[in-house]
């Protein structure tokens, strides 16, 4: 396919029926090898499609397994490097991630702008692969597809792969598309009116860390406009999974219902 043929690029695989237009037997390039890719690949293989996936390091999500509890965390982490060093020295990395999870938002907020950027540049891909894991049953199914040749994993540039191989469709499996979200009418109009601004590092929208209230172009709280979930990734980082969203919704409900 022509990589510029946008009609054959699925930008958001979570849109209703997004994968329905990919015909049976198609050869599909997935960009990204995280949990979104896993779901997309299993769906497409069920339609007899061949799937090739690529990412910079070719890392697949780790697999869930029971793990013991850790007694606690250090009193503070001064940098992303501190976090990664601590994780490396734990006897059970799954238990370490579980211990970090309730404190991740606080730790993220304690990093300055430079520290957050260092994390995103150097540690994010490893964090995502270990933090967002596959269920064992899903992992076995994916491993079976890889063994049969229905799914292939490639490390490197998606552009090079697309130019050197023939694909019928491309599916973006890189997670939430912040640029697309901010360009949709509701958020775009708020940003144009100065009632919202992009979040730190271009992720989601900027919000008050405690209340979720949107911040205006000048940094002041927007009147009665709040966000939860993925729109708060720049502010909180850990804001995409059900436990965190549930906690945010609970706090917001307590704030709004008086």
What residue spans do the PLM features occupy?
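Flavin (primarily FAD) cofactor-binding/catalytic cores of flavoenzymes
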Residues: 1-77, 83-258
């Amino acid at each position: 396919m022509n990589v510029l043929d946008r009609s054959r690029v699925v930008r958001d695989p979570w849109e209703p029926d997004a994968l329905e237009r990919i015909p049976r037997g198609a050869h599909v390039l997935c960009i990204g090898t995280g949990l979104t890719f896993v779901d997309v690949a299993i769906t497409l293989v069920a339609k007899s499609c061949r799937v090739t996936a690529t990412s910079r390091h070719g890392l697949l999500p780790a697999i869930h397994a029971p793990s013991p509890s850790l007694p606690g965390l250090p009193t503070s982490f001064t940098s992303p490097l501190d976090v990664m060093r601590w994780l490396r020295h734990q006897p059970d990395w799954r238990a370490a991630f579980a211990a970090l999870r309730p404190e991740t938002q606080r730790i993220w907020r304690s990093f300055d702008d430079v520290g957050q950027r260092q994390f995103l540049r150097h540690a994010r891909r490893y964090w995502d692969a270990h933090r967002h894991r596959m269920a064992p049953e899903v992992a076995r199914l994916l491993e079976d597809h890889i063994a049969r040749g229905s799914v292939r994993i490639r490390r490197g540039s998606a552009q090079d792969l697309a130019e050197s191989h023939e694909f019928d469709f491309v599916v973006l499996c890189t997670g939430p598309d912040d640029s697309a979200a901010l360009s949709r009418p509701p958020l775009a109009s708020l940003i144009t009116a100065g009632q919202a601004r992009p979040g730190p590092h271009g992720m989601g929208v900027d919000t008050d860390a405690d209340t979720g209230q949107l911040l205006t172009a000048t940094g002041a709280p927007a009147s009665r406009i709040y966000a939860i979930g993925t729109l708060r990734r720049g502010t909180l980082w850990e804001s995409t999974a059900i436990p965190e969203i549930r906690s945010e919704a609970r706090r917001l409900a307590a704030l709004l219902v008086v």
